[in-house]
Amino acid sequence: MTVQTFYLIGEKERSTRELDVGDPKTVNALRQGLAEVFNILSAEGIDFHDCHGPISTIESILRSESVGITVNGHPVRYPQQPQGIPIFGNHFEIYPDHLGNHERLFNKYGSVIRTNNMGRVTYLTNDPDIAALAFRDNDYFTKAPSSASHPLYGIRDQTALFLCDTESPAWKEAHKFIPPSMTPRAVRHYTPLLQQSVDTVFNVLDKFDNNGQAFNVYHLTAKLASQVICQLVLGVDLHHFDAVDSPVHPIIVLLQRYLTLNRRVQTKGAWYSYLPFGDPVALKNTRRELYGLIEEAVITCQKKNGGTTGDLPIQTAALHATCLVDYLARATDEHGNKLRHEYILSNTLALVGAGFVTSSAFLSWLIYSLVEYPGQQDRLLQELVDHGAVSDKRWTYDEIQALPFLDAFVKEAQRMHSPSFQPARNVKKDIILPGGWALPQGSILIPSIPHLHHHTAYWENPDRFDPDRWRTEKVKNRHRSVYVPFAAGPRSCIGFNVALQEVKISLAELVYRYEFVNATNEGIEYDPDFIVIRPVNFYVRAIRRTEWPARSP
């Protein structure tokens, strides 16, 4: 038996332990064992010290009186936060510009920061090594919106794939049925439906052009994204573009209100959510009303398709379904089981909600990138012409995937202007992260997507819009977690194939038909009270094209 005393430098009194280390053959084997004992998530970062300084051999470690441990050259340390004020904590240090202020705090305090927002404590990181660990669902991290500090707590639903805890019984069942509806094969089947939905916007854009009228881009893309997603999920035409002033469908009105109210409640202390008036009550009432409308839509869709369709194997059902609700009603696993009705209802809402909010904001930023960065719109138009675009072109999935500049443009826009920013994960144990950062059990860690995407250590000139960077070996061989627009791991976005095909078809159709011109007379602002980053005051004109470039030689 070989016993040695180990402790974490920076926390010697609390962490000192006498451990039987057996007969370790290598320093790396000892590191692995100690990482498990102390919940250090980067065993390779462990270094050893005695009273004289660093030690690096098994012999020196075992003969020392006691051995201190550092992680990646750092003692154990706790993330810092700005000095708060009573009741409000750091609220006014962060909002309204939470993107800019979190960047400032990363620069000041390091790669993991702590914020106290009216009593609600959250940790954020811009370190891709830490993000990669957080996105794993294992003994140390999970996704649990049922935790009161989680950003999705106000809209949690233990029967919905996106909104339930990983440990919820529904997650395993829903995860079995829903992802097959979003595979590349399935998206290939849905591509004509996506294009048909996108093309409905032409009626309104032509009228804007005839009147010489600029428009608020997010107002338009919110209508467009919801038109597309409701056609895809529910098989219903929202008639958003029958006329310039066509009203937004009640489902979408309620959905936007629901998500805004949740953000308002979750960016304040837990106490705020218990108030018997104001936003917390409105959130509950909106939830009830929204679920009612979704249930009506699901039942209507099932009745419409129920008389002429039959059950299909789960792996091929999406290739024959008219929409995702039709798929969920028909998909059958190897045991003849189907997704239960209550799961269909909640996951339909989750699919509509997640698909709408992300795509609507991202489409806005894509149009922003067309008009803000010189030459990009012309390059994209040229590529479309070179690949056979015409006014009545019916794009296939493979044709859209074969447009390299379109792909690079979308990637770069998503890097520069990611609408998603808070893929929160729950810490299951007291842990020590790379860099020696200690987080307590029960805390919330958010890998901050915008700050990962702009990290100067991993991106050359990160504030420069450069689609060509995606052709370089440096970017092709980048750290896997420095670009995570759809998060990563088992709880990543399952709809990314659909989302990317939707925005690519939208760009192909819109850029071929219209030239977009910036009509904004002030700096672009984003909405701090929404669940994604969306521009609120961005205006453009869409001018109908009358001529196109010749094909490249």
From Swiss-Prot:
It is a single-pass membrane protein. Pfam families: p450. The keyword Transmembrane applies. SUPFAM superfamilies: Cytochrome P450. GO terms for cellular component: membrane. It comes from the Eukaryota. Heme binds at C493. Induction: Expression is controlled by the asperlin biosynthesis cluster-specific transcription factor alnR. The chain crosses the membrane at residues 351-371. Pathway: Polyketide biosynthesis. Glycans are attached at N518. This is Cytochrome P450 monooxygenase alnD. The lineage of its organism: Eukaryota, Fungi, Dikarya, Ascomycota, Pezizomycotina.
